[in-house]
Amino acid sequence: MLFRSSDRLALLKPFLPWDGNDFIDLPILLKAKGKCTTDHISQAGIWLKYRGHLDKISNNTYIGAINAFSELPGHTNDPFDNNKPILIPELARKYMKNNISWLVIGDENFGEGSSREHAAMQPRYLGCKAIIVRSFARIHEANLKKHGILPLTFFNPKDYEKILADDKISIVNLHQLAENLPLKVIIKHKNNTSETIVCNHSLSEVQINWFKAGSALNALAQEI
């Protein structure tokens, strides 16, 4: 039996499946600069007591990350409040409250460190649709796939530098998502100019089904 008042245990609800639409004009929650480990994404320590409560532990999401758009670790700029500094998970919750999905931009070996599954579950819970990086740590990339987040890598690593704070990102032609087929990503700048870049993925046919179902567990449930 679980008590609703518990702040350590809560039932998990299945993540929603992909709705069949492209990801259009996603805001950038974070542009991670340099090393971003699973501990930067989901810190341990005092937070471990909330491992059984996804909503509670999600309050630590990316609080250890260095954001290229902020001078304060774990912070970003709040577009809902004149770009004032705000903790990254607090902005994620504002997006969540307004039904706005978002993405993350990352540097090299994104998600290195311990194989912390919460480092994928928390962003997914808060509304992350995709993460685009120069390169992934293998286990973190696998965990993102399992929980329905689209993990992409820049075809040209220098495209990381093109991403600006107020950009909106669109990932298009998702209905054509297939093994070994790169995806087109459109960067829309605040001045109404745009650039199109190419991103790669390593999704297998089975993992593409995970993405469409919303998670690996959802896909498994569909087979029962």
Give short role names for the model-derived ranges.
Residues 1-224:
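Fe-S-dependent hydro-lyases/dehydratases of central metabolism
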